[in-house]
């Protein structure tokens, strides 16, 4: 079924270039998806190069296994990039990786396939899990969460200003029958939204918040960034593409913190080893955005932000 839905890789050339790939280098693609970045990176690697891909999505893993069968330099692992530290240590690669790429968010095939339950535009089962075999679905959360919990998810993760109003409408309606379909939930949210933003579906922010919560996306990102830093060799590159302000803020603060030194906010007279004050990352250039040409070809790239850093120690 995944072959039906096309995915256009965002910031493809820019991301691969930012990794500054060496022919014999070892690289991690923490968000394999449909393999756009991985295939482009493999083209830059020589016979001694290695690429390890991660993804939670079973359909992405199928694509990854096909690529691994074609190219012996590539290996795919069905794990969240939050767990890349465990995988890297198990393979004896900690501190030896030359570059890590994280392309965050949900892919076009996931959004466009109604059966995955991510979209408010196409009716399908209310699921939203990147890996349908793990965790609770969006329908289960909506069925069991309190009104306050639902409102918090919409407000904190979706940045939805009418979160309380929407949560109240959901709890009232679920007393009659459970929410099982995306269109059903989207309709109730839409009615509860009194001020639609021009050009934006009124369910957009609530669905984003629900998806982020169901998949623990921000928690995974924080763990993944820490693990990526430890996996990198000195001189290795960390390249992260984010798609909304919550993700980008985490990435920006992480890179800034390690570019200043981990003890930057501590009093200088504390008995702390001076090395703690030394930066671990160097920020490379300014944040990059999709070009006008890419925006025309792929409107979903409009919110993409890419940040790049190099490991110093």
Swiss-Prot record:
Annotated EC: 2.1.1.199
Gene3D superfamilies per the UniProt record, alphabetical: Putative methyltransferase TM0872, insert domain, Vaccinia Virus protein VP39
Entries under InterPro entries matching the protein: RsmH (IPR002903), SAM-dep_MeTrfase_MraW_recog (IPR023397), SAM-dependent_MTases_sf (IPR029063)
Keyword vocabulary terms for this entry: Cytoplasm, Methyltransferase, rRNA processing, S-adenosyl-L-methionine, Transferase
Any one annotated GO CC term: cytoplasm
Subcellular location as annotated: Cytoplasm
Gene Ontology molecular function: any one: rRNA (cytosine-N4-)-methyltransferase activity
Claim: S-adenosyl-L-methionine is one of the keywords in the record: yes
Any one biological process term the GO annotation gives: rRNA base methylation
Binding of S-adenosyl-L-methionine, residues: 35-37, 55, 81, 103, 110
Reaction catalysed by this enzyme: cytidine(1402) in 16S rRNA + S-adenosyl-L-methionine = N(4)-methylcytidine(1402) in 16S rRNA + S-adenosyl-L-homocysteine + H(+)
Annotated function: Specifically methylates the N4 position of cytidine in position 1402 (C1402) of 16S rRNA.
Annotated NCBIfam families: 16S rRNA (cytosine(1402)-N(4))-methyltransferase RsmH (TIGR00006)
Family: Belongs to the methyltransferase superfamily. RsmH family.
Protein name: Ribosomal RNA small subunit methyltransferase H
Taxonomic lineage of the native organism: Bacteria, Pseudomonadati, Pseudomonadota, Gammaproteobacteria, Pseudomonadales
């Amino acid at each position: 079924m995944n072959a039906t839905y096309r995915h256009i890789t965002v910031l493809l050339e820019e991301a691969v270039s930012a990794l500054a790939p060496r022919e014999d280098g070892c690289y991690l693609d923490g968000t394999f998806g449909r393999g756009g970045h991985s295939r482009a990176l493999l083209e830059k690697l020589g016979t001694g190069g290695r690429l390890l891909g991660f993804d939670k999505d079973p359909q992405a893993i199928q694509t990854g296994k096909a690529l691994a069968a074609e190219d012996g330099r590539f290996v795919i692992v069905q794990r969240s990039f939050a767990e890349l530290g465990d995988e890297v240590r198990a393979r004896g690669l900690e501190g030896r990786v030359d570059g890590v790429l994280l392309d965050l968010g949900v892919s076009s095939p996931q959004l466009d396939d109604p059966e995955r339950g991510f979209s408010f535009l196409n009716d399908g089962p209310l699921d939203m899990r990147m890996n349908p075999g793990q965790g609770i679905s969006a329908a289960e959360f909506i069925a069991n969460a309190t009104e306050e919990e639902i409102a918090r998810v919409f407000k904190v993760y979706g940045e939805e200003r009418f979160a309380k109003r929407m949560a109240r409408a959901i709890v009232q309606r679920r007393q009659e029958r459970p929410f099982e379909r995306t269109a059903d939930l989207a309709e109730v949210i839409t009615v509860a939204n009194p001020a639609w933003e021009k050009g934006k579906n009124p369910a957009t922010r609530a669905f984003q918040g629900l998806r982020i919560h169901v998949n623990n996306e921000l928690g995974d990102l924080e763990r993944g960034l820490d693990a990526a830093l430890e996996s990198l060799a000195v001189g290795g590159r960390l390249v992260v593409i984010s798609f909304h302000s919550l993700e980008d803020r985490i990435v920006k603060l992480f890179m800034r913190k390690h570019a200043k030194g981990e003890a930057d906010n501590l009093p200088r007279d504390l008995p702390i080893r001076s090395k703690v004050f030394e930066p671990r990352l160097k920020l490379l250039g300014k944040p990059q955005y999709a070009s006008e040409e890419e925006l025309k070809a792929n409107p979903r790239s409009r919110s993409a932000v890419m940040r790049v850093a190099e490991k110093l120690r």
